[in-house]
Amino acid sequence: MATAERRALGIGFQWLSLATLVLICAGQGGRREDGGPACYGGFDLYFILDKSGSVLHHWNEIYYFVEQLAHKFISPQLRMSFIVFSTRGTTLMKLTEDREQIRQGLEELQKVLPGGDTYMHEGFERASEQIYYENRQGYRTASVIIALTDGELHEDLFFYSEREANRSRDLGAIVYCVGVKDFNETQLARIADSKDHVFPVNDGFQALQGIIHSILKKSCIEILAAEPSTICAGESFQVVVRGNGFRHARNVDRVLCSFKINDSVTLNEKPFSVEDTYLLCPAPILKEVGMKAALQVSMNDGLSFISSSVIITTTHCSDGSILAIALLILFLLLALALLWWFWPLCCTVIIKEVPPPPAEESEEEDDDGLPKKKWPTVDASYYGGRGVGGIKRMEVRWGEKGSTEEGAKLEKAKNARVKMPEQEYEFPEPRNLNNNMRRPSSPRKWYSPIKGKLDALWVLLRKGYDRVSVMRPQPGDTGRCINFTRVKNNQPAKYPLNNAYHTSSPPPAPIYTPPPPAPHCPPPPPSAPTPPIPSPPSTLPPPPQAPPPNRAPPPSRPPPRPSV
């Protein structure tokens, strides 16, 4: 009776697992389209799963966890194996990179019926056997083991489990442990590489989905790119290896960069720097053009390697002399062009006559060809003066027609009202479209500030070019070259002295020489008649330059005569 109930319960679990698988695949496909975290590392991944009786009612959660995590490792160079343990260990799927076989292995894993004791060391033995045989075949691929259990191990079982885990590590494997619910964290920390390699799940099997991202991040060791990817043949260089998980090794000092040259020779180099996302490694010298080096990384001092699809190729490189010669020729051509442009400015001097200023065009001209002037209009202005001596009074009225240019020279009366002529401004009319609508202003573009600055720079360069081009002699101009000669002055400079006492020979002053006096004649006798007055000499002294001090200037006009 108990056997029949157990079979019925197993069939029910199978149907429930099948329905769950359909839902999981549908949901997983949608999540993969959205894009999520994935691992591109090329290594061997072993799942060691506890199928003892304590997980009988939680096997679906374990399967769901493994199925989701397996789909995160998408490298074509990654191989996977499924191992279960209870009283003994069983390999459900041997190591393979075939995705179809991995899908079939997941189906076999779903059909597992838990039961028995927790002999974890049996699962590690099955993994170590595969690692050993793979290494003997020469693959030497890095291995990652993820072991899951839910209970505490007995003292003797813990001893065997730790021993087998150390054996797997000696073969080059990295061991991670997942503990669910009633596990002993101290035991798992000794079985795994370190305490950081343990993922506790204290909230039960339902919380396994929450650690998938953490396991993927810590267990994934991948090589994504190499810089540079193309090198010069026969030259030494350094390569930067980009990737993830390079510090997940137990000992960072055991990390190596490996170069597999033409799939035949493997050369290992110690990196200069080891970070979680990159390695700085010296690369070997590849002497021939066309050689290829596949990039690998070892986390255990060359015991096993993490492969990748990153390849470094060699090419022929020149020594740079051709480029240097080309740059030198371009520089010489540029120097000759500048010399041809600026040599006339430095040597030839052209003197040109200044052109007369252009005559300003006036809108209105009078009869003489002179532009008419607008004079102010003045009312009630009286000015005196007409006729000889200004005797007759003259009345001048500036009316609406304005005055003449001569009238502007007269003095303005006190009661005059001046009206200045108004200046008329013509504003440009806005341009209208055919439908009598004004053209809308164009919207401001995002590149308008940049375009404005470039236009201003272009205007500045254009002005400088125009200034230089105007100074250059035109064809047909003649001139002469400037010769600069330094003349040495032997006489030292003297300070000018303005004091007359210090001058040795003052300039001669003009001396006025009066004319000779007239000859003295004796007085005539009293009875003699009076002789005529002699005429003045023909030569007279020059008149004085300034007028006499007591003489007043003549009036500007004669005073008015009184009316009779």
From Swiss-Prot:
<feature type="region of interest" description="Interaction with PA">
    <location>
        <begin position="154"/>
        <end position="160"/>
    </location>
</feature>
<keyword id="KW-0812">Transmembrane</keyword>
<feature type="binding site">
    <location>
        <position position="118"/>
    </location>
    <ligand>
        <name>a divalent metal cation</name>
    </ligand>
</feature>
<dbReference type="GO" id="GO:0031527">
    <property type="term" value="C:filopodium membrane"/>
</dbReference>
<feature type="signal peptide">
    <location>
        <begin position="1"/>
        <end position="32"/>
    </location>
</feature>
<dbReference type="GO" id="GO:0004888">
    <property type="term" value="F:transmembrane signaling receptor activity"/>
</dbReference>
<keyword id="KW-1015">Disulfide bond</keyword>
<feature type="binding site">
    <location>
        <position position="52"/>
    </location>
    <ligand>
        <name>a divalent metal cation</name>
    </ligand>
</feature>
<comment type="subunit">
    <text>Interacts with gelatin and type 1 collagen. Interacts with the actin cytoskeleton.</text>
</comment>
<dbReference type="InterPro" id="IPR008399">
    <property type="entry name" value="Anthrax_toxin_rcpt_C"/>
</dbReference>
<feature type="glycosylation site" description="N-linked (GlcNAc...) asparagine">
    <location>
        <position position="166"/>
    </location>
</feature>
<feature type="glycosylation site" description="N-linked (GlcNAc...) asparagine">
    <location>
        <position position="262"/>
    </location>
</feature>
<feature type="topological domain" description="Cytoplasmic">
    <location>
        <begin position="343"/>
        <end position="564"/>
    </location>
</feature>
<keyword id="KW-0966">Cell projection</keyword>
<dbReference type="GO" id="GO:0031258">
    <property type="term" value="C:lamellipodium membrane"/>
</dbReference>
<comment type="function">
    <text>Plays a role in cell attachment and migration. Interacts with extracellular matrix proteins and with the actin cytoskeleton and thereby plays an important role in normal extracellular matrix (ECM) homeostasis. Mediates adhesion of cells to type 1 collagen and gelatin, reorganization of the actin cytoskeleton and promotes cell spreading. Plays a role in the angiogenic response of cultured umbilical vein endothelial cells. May also act as a receptor for PLAU. Upon ligand binding, stimulates the phosphorylation of EGFR and ERK1/2.</text>
</comment>
<dbReference type="GO" id="GO:0030036">
    <property type="term" value="P:actin cytoskeleton organization"/>
</dbReference>
<dbReference type="Pfam" id="PF00092">
    <property type="entry name" value="VWA"/>
</dbReference>
<feature type="compositionally biased region" description="Basic and acidic residues">
    <location>
        <begin position="402"/>
        <end position="422"/>
    </location>
</feature>
<dbReference type="GO" id="GO:0001568">
    <property type="term" value="P:blood vessel development"/>
</dbReference>
<feature type="domain" description="VWFA">
    <location>
        <begin position="44"/>
        <end position="215"/>
    </location>
</feature>
<dbReference type="Pfam" id="PF05586">
    <property type="entry name" value="Ant_C"/>
</dbReference>
<comment type="similarity">
    <text>Belongs to the ATR family.</text>
</comment>
<comment type="subunit">
    <text>(Microbial infection) Interacts (via VWFA domain) with the protective antigen (PA) of B.anthracis. Binding does not occur in the presence of calcium.</text>
</comment>
<feature type="region of interest" description="Disordered">
    <location>
        <begin position="493"/>
        <end position="564"/>
    </location>
</feature>
<feature type="modified residue" description="Phosphoserine">
    <location>
        <position position="362"/>
    </location>
</feature>
<keyword id="KW-1063">Hypotrichosis</keyword>
<keyword id="KW-0597">Phosphoprotein</keyword>
<feature type="region of interest" description="Disordered">
    <location>
        <begin position="402"/>
        <end position="444"/>
    </location>
</feature>
<dbReference type="InterPro" id="IPR002035">
    <property type="entry name" value="VWF_A"/>
</dbReference>
<dbReference type="InterPro" id="IPR008400">
    <property type="entry name" value="Anthrax_toxin_rcpt_extracel"/>
</dbReference>
<dbReference type="GO" id="GO:0005518">
    <property type="term" value="F:collagen binding"/>
</dbReference>
<dbReference type="GO" id="GO:0005886">
    <property type="term" value="C:plasma membrane"/>
</dbReference>
<keyword id="KW-0472">Membrane</keyword>
<feature type="compositionally biased region" description="Pro residues">
    <location>
        <begin position="505"/>
        <end position="564"/>
    </location>
</feature>
<feature type="transmembrane region" description="Helical">
    <location>
        <begin position="322"/>
        <end position="342"/>
    </location>
</feature>
<keyword id="KW-0325">Glycoprotein</keyword>
<dbReference type="GO" id="GO:0051015">
    <property type="term" value="F:actin filament binding"/>
</dbReference>
<keyword id="KW-1003">Cell membrane</keyword>
<feature type="binding site">
    <location>
        <position position="54"/>
    </location>
    <ligand>
        <name>a divalent metal cation</name>
    </ligand>
</feature>
<dbReference type="GO" id="GO:1901202">
    <property type="term" value="P:negative regulation of extracellular matrix assembly"/>
</dbReference>
<dbReference type="GO" id="GO:0034446">
    <property type="term" value="P:substrate adhesion-dependent cell spreading"/>
</dbReference>
